[in-house]
Amino acid sequence: MASTIFVLNGPNLNALGKREPGIYGGKTLADIEAMCKAEAKLLGFDIDFRQSNHEGTLVDWLHEAGEKSVGIAINPAAYGHTSIAMHDAIRAITVPVVELHLSNIHAREEFRHKSMIAPAVKGVICGFGAQSYILALHALKNLTEKSK
């Protein structure tokens, strides 16, 4: 059985494809999940892909992923700018975590420029639309190979 990467998605990402496609693109979260699963198969990983609009649920999943996966890709969405709880949960995890965003958070409103979780993760990928997820999977592949 292949090693598992968790792909966690924060609030409002369930509305992708309908919500501000000029910023987030036209792909739905189901489209992105299918892309991730196909790419992960090529990389030799299984994917556990989840989305929640609730911060506490995401924190619980981070703890679970820290125990059950070889790496985590997380699109925290708006919680990336506000969640000390997610920052602290990531600090407690020993597997690599990559933060990703569909849009370039640094080219948007000033309140989106700072990520509360960026100091706790291995790296941040933003601004490449749905491709940000694929780049995160490749980063995790590289990070897990380095740790062997």
Swiss-Prot record:
Site (Transition state stabilizer): R19
CDD domains to which the protein is assigned, alphabetical: DHQase_II
GO molecular function, a single term: 3-dehydroquinate dehydratase activity
The EC number(s) this enzyme carries: 4.2.1.10
One family name in Pfam for this protein: DHquinase_II
Enzyme class: lyase
Metabolic or biological pathway: Metabolic intermediate biosynthesis; chorismate biosynthesis; chorismate from D-erythrose 4-phosphate and phosphoenolpyruvate: step 3/7
InterPro entries: DHquinase_II (IPR001874), DHquinase_II_CS (IPR018509), DHquinase_II_sf (IPR036441)
Assembly and binders: Homododecamer.
Family: Belongs to the type-II 3-dehydroquinase family.
Function, in words: Catalyzes a trans-dehydration via an enolate intermediate.
Record's protein name: 3-dehydroquinate dehydratase
Species of provenance: Sinorhizobium medicae (strain WSM419) (Ensifer medicae)
